[in-house]
């Protein structure tokens, strides 16, 4: 009887420990976005080649300028959006305020950014308060204000403007585009002569709105809840106000926003065609003499026209990659050592894929499978019709003699 009691006790204890174990993404799987921690902050540092950087995270305290830069790393399948379109980290200007959904490091031993205690977001950091340095620093979704609002169905409604010498303050609230019962929070946002104002195909200045009589040359004016989209940054402010954000861009109508989205979409399409589509190996069926059939899932967040280039019967090239999405080799171009083959199948999942996955699975056969094509590994693939170009040195792994090349360490990040 005693051994059954002890067995039950150990089972209960095991279940308790399991229940308290914090969630971490698993290799070869796309994590549920619902389990991510959400925060926002200003982009203050970028290491684009290693897909990492630092944010000044907005916490519970009121002294934003004191918040130390908080390192983050993009997961291999992370979705980055800027101006409502797919983006690479290099596309986003420093100072941009970004919305984040992130997880704990999948494997702390291989983290490219500092690993923090799992409860770090709850710790008080002096006058900065809590939340400024969350341990959830491996990012699934990174998006600017305009992208966030479009995804969530939100708009900024401008209440009034107070202006002097082409700079001043706008009182605005972020609300559901279609209305609702929730009471929006009003926010004071600064602007100045450098703020870009977009209307249709025009790029205007504050002085242009003043000249047209839409804004006063000096003083206050009601804007009657005008619905717009905003680009938001942060900059130091006078008068002892430590947490106040700044308008970098103001899109007055849908046409202007759509044009910004189109420009960024084309920028990213050209980037992916030159760097290849990132994907995850699902399965490999090995044949004889180096032959293999590879099944893989293309990563999500790209423009649909890129996925449309993967057609059954078409030729593809596949090259190994690291979790930073660096090509495994590139001294003679990524195509030099790539596996080449024919697409046997291209299928689309019937259900909505998790964030990070396109839901598009490809299967191709190659007569020379490379080491990087193993189940659970990240790789890059391109249709043969995409341009064959060389990638810059910082975007591919060398001869393997330098471990930092494959596995960047957090050593570059200063401790504050």
Language-model segment annotations:
Residues 5-14:
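Bacterial N-terminal signal peptides
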Residues 16-77, 82-416:
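Short, flexible, surface-exposed loop segments at domain boundaries
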